[in-house]
Amino acid sequence: MTELKRTPLYEQHRRAGAKLIDFGGWEMPVQYAGVIEEHKAVRSKAGLFDVSHMGEVELKGKDSLAFLQYLLTNDVSRIQDNQIQYSPMCTSAGGVVDDLLVYRYSREHFLLVVNAANTDKDFAWMQAQAEGFEISLENRSGDFAQLALQGPWAEKILQKLTSMDLAQINYYWFKHGEVDGVLCLISRTGYTGEDGFEIYLPPEHAPRMWERILEVGGSEGVQPIGLGARDTLRFEARLPLYGNELGPDITPLEAGLGFFVKLEKDNFIGKEALSAQKEKGVPRKLVGLEMIERGIARSHYPLQKEGKEIGFITSGSFSPTLNKNIALGLIPPEYAQIGETLDVIIRGKAVKARIIPSLFYKRQG
């Protein structure tokens, strides 16, 4: 059995009584107080996440921008220094290798943040596409710890530890500066549907930073949050999860991410396949579902219409915010009308669900 990797915060999680699980080869906290309580804390106050398992790849060289324009579906030329962009990274068939964040330091220097379980695969994929480009790629994942402070009180809490004016960091922008005396990269990003920040710092400083944020945020009710609530939070906000809404056999267009696929851009990997799919119309569409009958629709459960299998669930859970069982499913567009009823097959039994708008939660303001 392969030994599980641990983040620099493993001892903090263990001491806090977190329930630890294997997540993509990492021993990570799935919950502390409980998923529902943690979920509600992030929606109403603030939560602190250990996301140090995420991968970071540094890209340098005079062809850096040209390489990213070829590698990714989004138009990286649109972002400025200190700005961040989300993009799928596709195969030539249009399937998704991964979805990632691009941090631009300069035209010749970027940081790419990828999903934990995909880090090695992504790095190998990038290297394989790099031929002919004057660039260097380095897997820097071991050099960064990453904390995410999310929720309506996130800015107020983090501001106590830095002289930087956090209100000046706009959504999907970042700055370098000191937090509690440690030089960090701070970005206004997150995976919860709430306002918040992601803090990149040297691993040796992560345990103290974790403890300090929980300490100074105590009066605002900040709580440590596990991966269980991270999943229900992202799911309510319709943020895709690789392996569920995205994968080698699901295109960004099918997943409803057409906004991040710039087909007018010059040649990029997957352009031909995605252009053809757009012209022809997507064969499948991601829809929101609410359970009419009792049951939770889990990932990969079949979806049927009048006894005929038409698709499958990508993600499903109880929604603490809406107080009902909801899901996302991938089905042919002809079945995708709002209000249409479908059957989810749960342990061999057909359980009724209704199609609803898939953005289950959007924060106010």
From Swiss-Prot:
Signal peptide residues on this chain, from the entry's feature table: none
Cellular component, GO annotation: cytosol; glycine cleavage complex
UniProt GO MF annotations: aminomethyltransferase activity; transaminase activity
KW Transferase (keyword) present: yes
One Pfam entry name: GCV_T_C
Statement: the UniProt record of this protein carries the keyword Transferase: yes
Alphabetical GO biological process terms: glycine decarboxylation via glycine cleavage system
E.C. number(s) listed in UniProt: 2.1.2.10
Assigned protein family: Belongs to the GcvT family.
Function: The glycine cleavage system catalyzes the degradation of glycine.
Name assigned to this protein: Aminomethyltransferase
Species of provenance: Desulfitobacterium hafniense (strain Y51)
Gene: gcvT
